[in-house]
Amino acid sequence: MTPLIFVTGGVVSSLGKGIAAASLASILEARGLKVTMMKLDPYINVDPGTMSPFQHGEVYVTDDGAETDLDLGHYERYVRTRLSRKNSVTTGRIYENVIRKERRGDYLGATVQVIPHITDEIRRCIDEATAGFDVALIEIGGTVGDIESLPFLEAIRQVRTERGAEKAMFMHLTLVPYIAAAGELKTKPTQHSVKELRSIGIQPDVLLCRSEQAVPDSERRKIALFTNVSERAVISCPDIDVLYGMPLELLRQGLDELVIEQFKLRDKVAAADLSEWAAVVDAVKHPLDEVNIAVVGKYVDHQDAYKSVAEALRHGGLRQRTKVNLKWLEAQDLEGSDMSALQDIDGILVPGGFGDRGFEGKVQTSKFAREHKVPYFGICYGMQAAVVDYARHVADLDAANSTENDRQSPHPVIGLITEWRTATGEVEKRDEKSDLGGTMRLGLQEQRLKPGTLAREVYGKDVVAERHRHRYEFNNRYRTQLEDAGLVISGKSMDDTLVEVVELPRDMHPWFLACQAHPEFLSTPRDGHPLFIGFVRAAREKKAGGKLLKEARA
């Protein structure tokens, strides 16, 4: 039976439960334990796939094609374990499962209720996702006191009651606000948050106290006294300059030791080696170079919509001790402009998106990068914009477009995928009338790279696998015509049916590459990703006047 650490949050949302949980997981992993993580989200959507990026932020895609909360991105950036749809559970999915069972007659005529049927299904999902690991960390979304979270909190209360403290730990993240006028930290919100938890039968074992500054020992003792938590289990989590330094901070305060002791894992663990995290922090704090990258997107007012893209760009810089400064630009604002917003930029990235708003701005951005020899990296919709740009302005296919934006286009160089093969070999189909949710080409897919191309050079191998999330794809009817006009198709699906990567010849442009996949989902601070490392390197070379630079590794 896998020991479980349940992570809850109180007082306010967005305190960083995911970062805190992932940081602890990375320490336990460094101590030799096999670790996994899980997110329980209280919203009624089955998954975030159809939610607005402005409301929810990024939809993070796993290898098996699950559309999940962006916190799973945090988890995979901190631990080596690759997660799946089992690791992301919503209220919507729980109710969907229970109602399906009720319709089948699985409950034998019983009245289906929150307790025990909903809570049992939550516990079943937890057991399924965590089996076979030495320890699992499970984050409960939302804030204690939210009505939506109650079934999840009741389920984890039951788990603790049945398994005991040696198999279940409660960790509560709470806010200790600093009141400038009084010049002091206030512990009362934390006391009330714990009181709320205790009212539903949960006594925290550990408190993580988020604050602008370190919580002094006197305040920690006060919190311990009023919350019935051991003083050494009241952990200070002050604001820090580098988030990837959080594992080092939690290790310093001995949070991992609390877990080892409570779960009696002493015989399984070794000393924690966090040298990789120390190297990451050092690279962030002591860069040798810096570049300015423009990100031209549709949802830049809510930058969490591009969380993995921003992190992957920074990771690409870390591998070269280069600080990456991001300039966020709204694609729609560039339509019909003189593109002066892209002056003094060392590289341009156009990320994914959906719908016609801002698409012409992305096409215009591709044209600017192509004509001005600025390194260009297109991802998903950014690749489709690059293809449309090339078709219109180089291949003379006037009014070329994507059928997503113009179904009457005389040259639909981008069209709806109606059939594709999944990573498991199954064939999936869809049409214009299919539901939006869960009907895209999703998950890890292999692709073969063309020898002698930029993509093959950057990746360093012939076959690579990337995660996908898209409905539209390069129209194969235009392959030959665009290749004859000079466009290089450097990556294709293994069955040769789908175009995965396009680029410009090196004699036409120093670094212009666009891919249909989402490589940002496989980038980590410790390893980076070949495409992002190559893109940042190209930006450095542009800044240096086109000189080849020797890569400085973190």
Curated annotation (Swiss-Prot):
Catalytic activity: UTP + L-glutamine + ATP + H2O = CTP + L-glutamate + ADP + phosphate + 2 H(+); L-glutamine + H2O = L-glutamate + NH4(+); UTP + NH4(+) + ATP = CTP + ADP + phosphate + 2 H(+)
A Pfam family annotated for this UniProt entry: GATase
Record bears the keyword Nucleotide-binding: yes
Record-linked CDD domains: CTPS_N (cd03113), GATase1_CTP_Synthase (cd01746)
Origin superkingdom: Bacteria
Annotated region described as Amidoligase domain, given as residue ranges: 1-265
MF terms in GO: ATP binding; CTP synthase activity; glutaminase activity; identical protein binding; metal ion binding
Domain (Glutamine amidotransferase type-1): residue spans on this chain: 292-545
One annotated GO biological process: pyrimidine nucleobase biosynthetic process
Catalytic residues of the enzyme: 380 (nucleophile), 518, 520
Binding locations of UTP: 13, 186-191, 222
Residues that coordinate or bind CTP: 13, 146-148, 186-191, 222
PANTHER family, A to Z: CTP SYNTHASE, CTP SYNTHASE-RELATED
Function: Catalyzes the ATP-dependent amination of UTP to CTP with either L-glutamine or ammonia as the source of nitrogen. Regulates intracellular CTP levels through interactions with the four ribonucleotide triphosphates.
Assembly with partners or alone: Homotetramer.
Protein's recorded name: CTP synthase
Organism whose genome encodes this protein: Xanthomonas euvesicatoria pv. vesicatoria (strain 85-10)
Gene: pyrG
